[in-house]
C-alpha cells in the first residue's frame, strides 16, 4: 500500500496557465508525476514546462471534456481552476458546474483522488463565488473518492499592487487605520508544493486544509511599513473609508434593478468590501474572531523577499484577478 501511495501518478491538471497553476505543474513534475493539462481552446501554452501533455477543452461542456480525456486512464485531478471575475454567473459556471463535470468525468476514467485549490475566504461566505466554491466542496466530499481541499490565505501577488505607488513616492492606501485585516501571505511556489504533496501525504487526505506562508500574520499597515522600509522611503499612508464601498454597493444594487449589467458591478464592489474588512486567516466560529495562531504556516518564501524582487524589477505585477488594489 505504501509503495502504491508513493508511485508516480497520472494527473489531470486544471487551471494550468495561471500563475499558481504554472507553479503547480512544475511541482507535480518535480514529484515525478505525469501531467495532462486541460486548457481553454486558443490559450497559449508556451509558458508550460516541457514534459506535460496539453489538451484543449471547454470545461463547461461535458462532451468537450470527454473528447479531451479520450480513452486515457488517470489517477488524480489537481485543480487550480477558478472563475476569472467572481461575477455570479461566472462563479457558478466555473467554480461549481465545471468542476462537477470534471469530477464526473474523472471518476469515469479511473481517478481515485482530487486535490482542489479553494480559498480561505469561503469559511465566511458572503459572496456568490464563495457559495459556488462551497457547493462544489460539498459535492467533492460526498463523491466517494479521496479528496484534499486546500484553502490558502492571500498570495504574494494579491498584496503587491502598491509597489509601484511606493516607488513613485505616492502614499500607501489603507482601509480604515490599516489594522482591520491581517493575513499570512504565501507564494505561488510554496502553495504549489503543498498541493503536490497532497497526492502522497495521507495525513492530508479527506481534509479541509487552510494554509498560509511562513512568519507572523501581517496587517495591511504592516505590509505598507515593510514595503517603505525595503524601498528606503519614509512611510506615508492615506486612509480610504470603508463606507465608500457601502455607498457604491447601494447605488449599483438599486440601478441594477433596471440596468442588469450593473448587478455584476455591485457584486465586484461587495468583493472589494469583503477583502477590505475580512482577514485571510482561520475563522474561530466559537469565539467569532480570526485566529492567526490557528492558521498553519508552510514554505520558505517570504513577502519581504517578494517585495525586494519587485522593487529591483525582477518580478512583474502579475496579479490579474488576484488584485486587491
Could you tell me what each predicted segment is?
Residues 175-181, 207-217, 231-232, 240-242, ...:
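Glycine-rich Rossmann NAD(P)(H)-binding loop
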Residues 178-199, 207, 219:
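Substrate-positioning beta->alpha
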Residues 43-108, 121-123:
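NAD(P)H-binding glycine-rich loop region in Rossmannoid oxidoreductase-like domains
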Residues 83-169:
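Glycine-/Pro-rich loop/turn segments that contact NAD(P) or position catalytic residues
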Residues 20, 191, 195, 211, ...:
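Non-catalytic, hydrophobic alpha-helical segments
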Residues 243-325:
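A hydrophobic C-terminal alpha-helical subdomain
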Residues 158-165, 198-209, 233-235:
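Glycine/proline-rich active-site loop of Rossmann-fold NAD(P)-dependent oxidoreductases
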Residues 8-33:
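N-terminal Rossmann NAD(P)H-binding glycine-rich loop of SDR-like oxidoreductase domains
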Amino acid at each position: 500500500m505504501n509503495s502504491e501511495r508513493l508511485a508516480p501518478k497520472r494527473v489531470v491538471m486544471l487551471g494550468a496557465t495561471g500563475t499558481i497553476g504554472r507553479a503547480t505543474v512544475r511541482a507535480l513534475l518535480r514529484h515525478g508525476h505525469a501531467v495532462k493539462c486541460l486548457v481553454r481552446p486558443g490559450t497559449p501554452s508556451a509558458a508550460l514546462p516541457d514534459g506535460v501533455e496539453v489538451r484543449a477543452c471547454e470545461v463547461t461542456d461535458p462532451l468537450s471534456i470527454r473528447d479531451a480525456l479520450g480513452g486515457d486512464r488517470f489517477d488524480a485531478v489537481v485543480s487550480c481552476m477558478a472563475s476569472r471575475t467572481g461575477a455570479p454567473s461566472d462563479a457558478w459556471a466555473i467554480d461549481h458546474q465545471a468542476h462537477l463535470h470534471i469530477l464526473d468525468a474523472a471518476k469515469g476514467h479511473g481517478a481515485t483522488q482530487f486535490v482542489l485549490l479553494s480559498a480561505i475566504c469561503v469559511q465566511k461566505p458572503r459572496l456568490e463565488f464563495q457559495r459556488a466554491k462551497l457547493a462544489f466542496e460539498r459535492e467533492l466530499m460526498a463523491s466517494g473518492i479521496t479528496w484534499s481541499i486546500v484553502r490558502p490565505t492571500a498570495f504574494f501577488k494579491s498584496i503587491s499592487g502598491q509597489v509601484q505607488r511606493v516607488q513613485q513616492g505616492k502614499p500607501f492606501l489603507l482601509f480604515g487605520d490599516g489594522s482591520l485585516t491581517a493575513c499570512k501571505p504565501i507564494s505561488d511556489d510554496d502553495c504549489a508544493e503543498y498541493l503536490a504533496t497532497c497526492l502522497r501525504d495521507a495525513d492530508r487526505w479527506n481534509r479541509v486544509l487552510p494554509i498560509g506562508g511562513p512568519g507572523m500574520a501581517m496587517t495591511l499597515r504592516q505590509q505598507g511599513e515593510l514595503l517603505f522600509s525595503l524601498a528606503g522611503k519614509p512611510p506615508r499612508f492615506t486612509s480610504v473609508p470603508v463606507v465608500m464601498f457601502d455607498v457604491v454597493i447601494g447605488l449599483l444594487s438599486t440601478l441594477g434593478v433596471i440596468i442588469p449589467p450593473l448587478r455584476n458591478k455591485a457584486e465586484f464592489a461587495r468583493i472589494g468590501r469583503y477583502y477590505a474588512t475580512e482577514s485571510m486567516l482561520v475563522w474561530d466560529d466559537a469565539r467569532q474572531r480570526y485566529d492567526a495562531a490557528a492558521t498553519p504556516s508552510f514554505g520558505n518564501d517570504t513577502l519581504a523577499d517578494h517585495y525586494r524582487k519587485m522593487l529591483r524589477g525582477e518580478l512583474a505585477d502579475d496579479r490579474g484577478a488576484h488584485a486587491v488594489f
